[in-house]
Regions:
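N-terminal active-site segment of His-dependent metallophosphoesterases
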Residues: 1-81, 181
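Metal-dependent phosphoesterase/phosphodiesterase active-site architecture
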Residues: 3-8, 226, 231-292
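Acidic/histidine-rich helix-loop elements
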Residues: 27-48, 72-74, 106-121, 144-152, ...
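Active-site environment of divalent metal-dependent phosphoester hydrolases
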Residues: 32-35, 72-75, 81, 103-111, ...
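Extended active-site neighborhood of metal-dependent phosphoesterases/phosphodiesterases
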Residues: 76-160, 164, 196-202, 223, ...
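His/acidic metal-ligating clusters that form di-metal
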Residues: 50-63, 147-228, 254-255, 262-264, ...
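Beta-strand-turn-beta hairpins that frame and shape the catalytic cleft
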Residues: 15-24, 127-137, 163-171, 222-227, ...
Length: 292
């Protein structure tokens, strides 16, 4: 757990505040079964680099959130590749893990080859707790589709869980962002009917919603609750493309800190990458579906 003393003395003036809880969010690495993403990006290595950057900065997260699209093509080998680096990070930091699958994931294969569980179908909805903080992951993936949905049973289960507040509040994780996007492409593949989720979390102890999917950093609100959309570790989407989806090498991960007084700060941590275009497709392009 983060430094609950909340501050440390400095020679420059007021004490520096320390977080009570730290969450690191890695999203959309799109790890292939072998080789490189788009033939150029070592997506697996970028997850490794993210972990090493945390360690080098002295960041020891309480929770590691993987917010979907862990595999690029839903292959078992991708999860097998990822598992050692994720398990090593959990041991290294003493962190808990929460996974919210994305549209590129196969939930049954993810359960078996990343989490070491039985190959069950159906949504992967989970709850993790650290101290008085509750982190809920809800699975918005729809088999063979790009957009996200939450069914009635999931929303009912979420409402039941939220009926009893957690001492330090709740962070909700869902792969598909429940907020508007600046590009039509991202809007088309976002979470459908976000107002239904808004109705469930309104007035509850949910203090932050974490998402991924769009490969860009953005923020908004849902039912008055802040929403943070994390970047991809594998690529960075161009927010100024009016009619398609263009990605550059780059990306990063997110660090979310919760302080003793309840303040929450989300920070984008960039990974270095060459400024090259990885793909550039339009809404009517036959190559569109494989990349979103």
């Amino acid at each position: 757990m983060g430094d609950s003393t909340a501050s440390a003395s400095t020679p420059l003036g007021p004490p520096v505040r320390r977080p009570r809880y730290t969450i690191v969010q890695i999203s959309d690495p799109h790890v292939p079964a072998d080789g490189f993403l788009f033939g150029r990006v070592d997506a697996y290595e970028r997850v490794e680099v993210s972990v090493e950057m945390m360690a080098a900065a002295g960041c020891s997260p309480d929770v590691l959130v993987l917010s979907g699209d862990l595999a690029d093509r839903a292959e078992a080998e991708a999860y097998i590749r990822l598992r050692p680096v994720i398990e090593a990070a959990l041991v290294r930091f003493g962190a808990k893990l929460l996974v919210a699958p994305g549209n590129h994931d196969d939930v049954a294969l993810l359960r078996v080859h990343l989490l070491g569980r039985a190959p069950e179908r159906g949504p992967l909805d989970e709850v993790a707790r650290v101290g008085g903080l509750r982190i809920i992951g809800i699975d918005s993936s729809v088999p063979d589709e790009v957009h996200g949905e939450l069914d009635d049973a999931q929303l009912k289960a979420l409402a039941d869980e939220l009926a009893e507040p957690a001492p330090d509040g709740t962070v909700l994780v869902v792969h598909h962002p429940p907020i508007w996007s600046t590009t039509p492409m991202s809007e088309l593949v976002a979470l459908r009917e976000p107002r239904r989720l808004a109705a469930v979390i309104r007035g509850t102890d949910v203090r932050l919603v974490l998402s991924g999917h769009t490969h860009r950093v953005s923020a908004g609100t849902l039912a008055g609750v802040p929403v943070w959309v994390s970047p991809s570790t594998g690529s960075h989407a161009d927010v100024l493309v009016p009619d398609g989806f263009r990605a550059h090498a780059g990306g990063g991960f997110s660090r979310i800190d919760i302080l003793d007084d309840g303040e929450i700060v989300a920070t984008f941590v960039p990974l270095t990458g060459r400024d090259e275009i990885l793909y550039d497709v339009r809404l009517d392009d036959a190559e569109l579906r494989p990349v979103v």
